[in-house]
């Protein structure tokens, strides 16, 4: 799922949090050879972490579809020309701040779009899905999905990444996503009985799954 999450001022705040000595060799967190070639930060400033956590919790779409319960903002990534990240599944143990908490979904938020290549892609049940994210746009995906970043051919790609826990399963979130989209379509005519019914069903499912 892709969603516009940060505005220009918020993007600037995130970029301002990148220090002079922030980045290290990204291979430190991925022990397998030839998996990635990028730079990865040693952490995220507290003010940036709080900003992103609040944005995740406040996003209506994310709340309706994923019902996040705990959000962890972990690190920045940077990709210059020639950098890439091959297909992989996230390695939680490489990040001590995760405290062995179980996470259900990952997110990657782009902080720049003045680059070429660098598309994020996922291996799903229906095939490979890829997209070049706009600045401020987030990709949200089940943590079990193998994912990667195509080689950057020009410019600098910067993003911030994290995970969150959820009260609903992947199958349930797919159903909630469909209900949300129906709601959005029918909300242009709030007198439509189907709209009211869809909202009630969605709220009921969230309540039942949260027990």
Model-derived features with residue positions:
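Non-heme Fe(II)/2-oxoglutarate
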Residues: 1-70, 75, 175-211
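Catalytic core of non-heme Fe(II) oxygenases with the double-stranded beta-helix
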Residues: 61-177
């Amino acid at each position: 799922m892709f969603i516009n999450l940060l505005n220009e001022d918020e993007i600037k705040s995130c970029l301002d949090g990148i220090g002079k000595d922030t980045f290290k060799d990204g291979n430190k967190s991925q022990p397998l050879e030839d998996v990635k070639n990028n730079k990865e930060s040693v952490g995220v400033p507290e003010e940036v972490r709080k900003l992103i956590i609040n944005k995740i919790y406040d996003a209506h779409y994310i709340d309706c579809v994923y019902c996040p319960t705990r959000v962890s903002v972990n690190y920045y990534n940077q990709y210059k020309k020639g950098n890439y990240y091959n297909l992989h599944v996230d390695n939680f143990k490489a990040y001590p701040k995760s405290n062995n908490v179980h996470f259900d979904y990952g997110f990657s938020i782009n902080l720049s779009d003045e680059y070429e290549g660098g598309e994020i892609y996922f291996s799903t049940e229906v095939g490979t899905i890829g997209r070049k994210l706009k600045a401020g746009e987030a990709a949200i995906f089940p943590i079990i999905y193998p994912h990667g970043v195509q080689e950057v051919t020009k410019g600098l790609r910067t993003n911030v990444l994290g995970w969150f826990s959820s009260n609903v399963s992947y199958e349930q979130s797919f159903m909630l996503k469909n209900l949300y989209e129906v709601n959005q379509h029918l909300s242009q005519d709030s007198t439509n009985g189907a709209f009211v019914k869809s909202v009630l069903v969605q709220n009921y499912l969230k309540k039942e799954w949260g027990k």
